[in-house]
Amino acid sequence: MSMLCYTLIIAFLIGIWAAPKSEDNVSLGSPATPDISDTSCAKTHEALKTSQNTDQHSPAPKKAEDQEFGSAANIIVDPKLFQKRRFQSPRVLFSTQPPPLSRDEQSVEFLDNADSLNRNIRAKRGIHPVHNQGEFSVCDSVNVWVANKTTATDIKGNEVTVMVNVKP
């Protein structure tokens, strides 16, 4: 089982490593495609030079952490990542609202539609007695266990003899 797990993890890592890089998930240091214009690279290079020049004129000492994360300000985040999406599935209906906690605390929206009541509220099942307990054991008619009984009535109503010792 562990060998299968290791194999799947290695296959996953190889797949990620061999996947082609797109412009969306590429780090700043490695371009994804060779058609990136030199002007954009030159602009970022000039911006870095000017920021370094302004930093050199300031008398405040810089920490090593600030120098490492100085280029992190140029990261652009796609606004599509933060949009709320409604999930769709052919088999499951995803609701945009949480189900009500109890019948008394239901909101007016759920009470307006009878279909939503049927879909969201479940009826509790009644507790059924278990009928098959001890069906292979010997039991007297008054439900008292006896050890010295030699005959019994089976499920179909036939008289059967009870074996005292069972050989394995």
From Swiss-Prot:
Summary of the tissues where the protein is detected: Expressed by the venom gland.
GO cellular component terms attached to this protein's record: axon; dendrite; extracellular space; synaptic vesicle
Keyword Transmembrane helix carried by entry: no
Subcellular location: Secreted
Residue numbers spanned by region Disordered: 48-70
Major location category of this protein: secreted
Keywords of this entry: Cleavage on pair of basic residues, Disulfide bond, Glycoprotein, Growth factor, Metalloenzyme inhibitor, Metalloprotease inhibitor, Protease inhibitor, Secreted, Signal, Toxin
Biological process, per Gene Ontology: cell surface receptor protein tyrosine kinase signaling pathway; modulation of chemical synaptic transmission; negative regulation of neuron apoptotic process; nerve development; nerve growth factor signaling pathway; neuron projection morphogenesis
Pfam family membership, one: NGF
Family of the protein in this entry: Belongs to the NGF-beta family.
Subunit structure: Homodimer; non-covalently linked.
Official protein name in the record: Venom nerve growth factor
Organism: Echis ocellatus (Ocellated saw-scaled viper)
